[in-house]
Amino acid sequence: MLYPTPIAKLIDSYSKLPGIGIKTATRLAFYTIGMEDDVVNEFAKNLLAAKRDLSYCSICGNLTDQDPCAICQDSTRDQSTILIVEDSRDVTALENIQEYHGLYHVLHGLISPMNGIGPDDINLKTLLTRLMENEVTEVIVATNATADGEATSMYISRVLKPAGIKVTRLARGLAVGSDIEYADEVTLLRAIENRTEL
């Protein structure tokens, strides 16, 4: 069906979001059009502010509104342990269990040979710099239990083992193919507590 240009453009914009198909995008567009002007203006303002005011921490790569992020600035955290995750949503999921008290490192992706993504295409160089400059004794790899997650964890283990850094992996309370951000808090807690050395 042909919609007026402004609605068609809004549908197109919504459909570019992950997990949003044309039907959902259409529903969202029409819902947005029916909202009060002040609500739409606040939504637009918040969207623009988030895009403008958020950046990645220069130390760990986590999404933040300050640099360095609050976690990297927190001197009470265990400076000898770094937990490596794929993206900032994983940091949030792990922070919600309130059991891990070390630092994080966000890769912004995984090594994926099938998709042409190698170690230089993700945030690994800053991790290696951090490890050389700080007294880190353990790195916990918390990538998803997928082929790319496994490839990434094995690469990290191969690179760090010669440096004498203990490299561990989250325990397998997480099902193969599952995403950390969707795991419940008890599963994540058990995975951290029962991590295994690589």
From Swiss-Prot:
PROSITE patterns: RECR, TOPRIM. Residues 80-175 form the Toprim domain. Keywords: DNA damage, DNA recombination, DNA repair, Metal-binding, Zinc, Zinc-finger. InterPro entries: DNA_Rcmb_RecR, Rcmb_RecR, Rcmb_RecR_Znf, TOPRIM_dom, TOPRIM_RecR. A zinc finger (C4-type) spans 57-72. GO terms for molecular function: DNA binding; zinc ion binding. One of its GO terms (biological process) is DNA repair. SMART domains: TOPRIM (SM00493). NCBIfam families: recR (TIGR00615). Belongs to the RecR family. May play a role in DNA repair. It seems to be involved in an RecBC-independent recombinational process of DNA repair. It may act with RecF and RecO. This is Recombination protein RecR. The gene is recR.
